[in-house]
Amino acid sequence: MGKMTIQQILMQLAGGMGTSIQIFAVTLIFSLPLGLFVALGRMSKNKLLQAVIKVYISIMRGTPLMLQLLVVYFGPYYIFGMRVGNSYRLWAVFIGFVINYAAYFAEIYRSGIQSMPVGQYEAAKLLGYSKSQTFIKIILPQVIKRILPSVTNEVITLVKDTSLAFTLSVMEMFTTAKALASSQVSMMPFVAAGIFYYVFNLVVAMFLEWLEKKLDYR
């Protein structure tokens, strides 16, 4: 590959940027609600369900995300003999990120739910609310306010973690920058990637800070 202009390099990086944003968005959209269901299962009175979810959370939090991505991608072939193509790489990244972050969000939800005073449940019962109504209308809105700072930390980590998709050769921002830096013998792609991650994190942090302040007024 010949020398590329700065404009050509930036155009290449833009494609990787789009994939990074896609990984970020898909992970959040699915892991946040999944994490809530996992948290509820973790607090279930069903001991078997509790134990299974506890093991799942322990594995997700106790092993590297990079290793989990490799297991999700190569697992179908080594365990079931299923052949997976290149198109599965991005899907494997989605699946790996969602199940990993759902475990972290589950623990955040759990700590928030368990911090709520028992008296609120009793007061809601006296007012004729069912358990599900109490949770959705009274408990959950307060939990979201309490856990938002912890969620913000995880979301900021997620922005940087999207670079781990390089493990499966998915052409996100870091993978693209690495390939361009090697072919062009230049640090510029890495500098551009660094600026992207910083600005992306800054925008996410500012949005979540604004959301936190807005919820505090309610």
Which residues fall in each region the model found?
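Transmembrane alpha-helices and adjacent helix-loop boundaries
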Residues: 1-218
